[in-house]
Amino acid sequence: MSTPRQILAAIFDMDGLLIDSEPLWDRAELDVMASLGVDISRRNELPDTLGLRIDMVVDLWYARQPWNGPSRQEVVERVIARAISLVEETRPLLPGVREAVALCKEQGLLVGLASASPLHMLEKVLTMFDLRDSFDALASAEKLPYSKPHPQVYLDCAAKLGVDPLTCVALEDSVNGMIASKAARMRSIVVPAPEAQNDPRFVLANVKLSSLTELTAKDLLG
């Protein structure tokens, strides 16, 4: 019989979990692609990009519809700048975020953020919502060889928190993020978007919620 693991830290994803930014990333991506003359009506030809780093998404577009002019890195920077601008305009904090972070603190957990988005965006978003002081460590996959579903960003966040990945619970909204956290051997809580709630792949998670407002101490600690 296995011994229940002791949970010492909670690590949150950002896009789609803390802020409703996935539609904003999509809008930023399509705005920039359209400006390059790319046929954005072919968006459905791309594989599932939810939770992927934006440079990986840009590479997928380029492989199907190469453009002339700006480099892929320049295009990535344009999409990021546009996404940040849209977040600042709309301030899309999702329900239950403050309460979820507070619950983690009440349970004595360290709190981290592990995201595919750039580090300066993580800082900006947390500061925007007065949450920066609640997070003990931030980890971004922007400069890593591989982003989610690779586990490295979760392993990096655990290292920054000074804890073993086995003592972490990860909170995610995407399949790619869930796979990353499970590959890091963490307890997994998923809060899928309504349209993804019935995705059978989420059976891999330890807990599935429809909103962070439902989060309990038992969900966190097991």
UniProtKB/Swiss-Prot annotation:
GO terms for molecular function: 2-deoxyglucose-6-phosphatase activity; glucose-6-phosphatase activity; magnesium ion binding; mannitol-1-phosphatase activity; metal ion binding; sorbitol-6-phosphatase activity; sugar-phosphatase activity. InterPro entries: Beta-PGM-like, HAD-like_sf, HAD-SF_hydro_IA, HAD_sf, PGP-like_dom2. This is Hexitol phosphatase B. Pfam families: Hydrolase (PF00702). It comes from Escherichia coli O157:H7. Substrate binds at residues 13-15, 115-116, 148. It catalyses: sugar phosphate + H2O = sugar + phosphate; 2-deoxy-D-glucose 6-phosphate + H2O = 2-deoxy-D-glucose + phosphate; D-mannitol 1-phosphate + H2O = D-mannitol + phosphate; D-sorbitol 6-phosphate + H2O = D-sorbitol + phosphate. Belongs to the HAD-like hydrolase superfamily. CbbY/CbbZ/Gph/YieH family. The active site is at residues 13, 15. Gene3D superfamilies: HAD superfamily/HAD-like (3.40.50.1000), Putative phosphatase, domain 2 (1.10.150.240). CDD domains: HAD_BPGM-like. Sugar-phosphate phosphohydrolase that catalyzes the dephosphorylation of D-mannitol 1-phosphate and D-sorbitol 6-phosphate. Also catalyzes the dephosphorylation of 2-deoxyglucose 6-phosphate (2dGlu6P); this is a biologically important activity in vivo since it contributes to the elimination of this toxic compound and plays an important role in the resistance of E.coli to 2-deoxyglucose. Requires the presence of a divalent metal cation for activity. Can use zinc, manganese, cobalt or magnesium. The keyword DNA repair does not apply. Its EC number is 3.1.3.68, 3.1.3.22, 3.1.3.50, 3.1.3.23. Keywords: Carbohydrate metabolism, Cobalt, Hydrolase, Magnesium, Manganese, Metal-binding, Zinc.
